[in-house]
Amino acid sequence: MTEVEKIYEFKEELGRGAFSIVYLGENKQTKQRYAIKVINKSELGKDYEKNLKMEVDILKKVNHPNIIALKELFDTPEKLYLVMELVTGGELFDKIVEKGSYSEADAANLVKKIVSAVGYLHGLNIVHRDLKPENLLLKSKENHLEVAIADFGLSKIIGQTLVMQTACGTPSYVAPEVLNATGYDKEVDMWSIGVITYILLCGFPPFYGDTVPEIFEQIMEANYEFPEEYWGGISKEAKDFIGKLLVVDVSKRLNATNALNHPWLKSNNSNNTIDTVKMKEYIVERQKTQTKLVN
């Protein structure tokens, strides 16, 4: 019996990836439940092993209410066990659609928590690099406004002067400076938050097309609109917030601190109801066309 098996009882499987299986685990003494990610080290390629090491290093460093926490780590010659905080609410967008509708103030509340978590990461010189709906999970089924950032597989810890140049992320959310291959920094996460906010408020992404190159062309020029049919009831402060994130010039893009001080996040009490029909359509379409850039 391994050390982790002495402490935790492994219950049902929660999910699996190419090299890992996630189980529901229960501490035998406290009865507290966790998600335990079991990674088969022998099957890892060099790139995946490097990303995994970076992910673990990051998880060890962070402690924020809106970031999924690493509780314990067990390393054996064959396997790595990550004992993680258990979140049970599912993916953010799925739960919004399930709820049927929500308000602009709800959206601002969610975005504020995401920006707070990203600002915390940036303060530690950590860039997530792959912020998207699938990586935004609800902590519980009961509270649709308590969100947590997950999946640090593409994240990097950066030095003060290091500029990253590896193309990574998911097409609809990737920042123009990543596509330009001229190097990029923390600002990429703020661009992704702009895209996520746009979708939260209307149900579809700002950049879309029949092919990935078409999407990239729109991103490179920040070519997007606020169609009146879907944005007529949304506040000008929300549009201004998005407009200050989806900026090609990174020097003009809001950082996390400035974003938290934006009027839309500081004092939003709008009860404008947001319909989720378009978001439901987007989720279905997204599941059909899951595509990633080469990491």
From Swiss-Prot:
EC number(s) recorded for this UniProt protein: 2.7.11.18
Ranges for region Autoinhibitory domain: 264-295
Reactions catalysed: L-seryl-[myosin light chain] + ATP = O-phospho-L-seryl-[myosin light chain] + ADP + H(+); L-threonyl-[myosin light chain] + ATP = O-phospho-L-threonyl-[myosin light chain] + ADP + H(+)
Similarity remark: Belongs to the protein kinase superfamily. CAMK Ser/Thr protein kinase family. CaMK subfamily.
Function: Phosphorylates a specific serine in the N-terminus of a myosin light chain. Phosphorylates regulatory myosin light chain (mlcR) during chemotaxis. mlcR phosphorylation increases the motility and actin-activated ATPase activity of myosin, contributing to chemotaxis.
InterPro entries attached to this UniProt entry: Kinase-like_dom_sf, Prot_kinase_dom, Protein_kinase_ATP_BS, Ser/Thr_kinase_AS
Active-site residues annotated for this sequence: D130 (proton acceptor)
GO molecular function: ATP binding; microfilament motor activity; myosin light chain kinase activity; protein serine/threonine kinase activity
Residues of the Protein kinase domain: 8-265
SMART domains (alphabetical): S_TKc (SM00220)
Regulation acting on activity, per entry: Possesses an autoinhibitory domain. Autophosphorylation appears to increase the enzymatic activity. Activation is gbdC-dependent. Does not have a calmodulin-binding domain.
Impact reported for T289A: Great increase in phosphorylation
Designated name of the protein: Myosin light chain kinase A
Organism of derivation: Dictyostelium discoideum (Social amoeba)
Keyword ATP-binding: yes
Processing and modification events after translation: Autophosphorylated. Transiently phosphorylated on Thr-166 and Thr-289. This phosphorylation is gbpC-dependent.
Cell wall biogenesis/degradation in keyword set: no
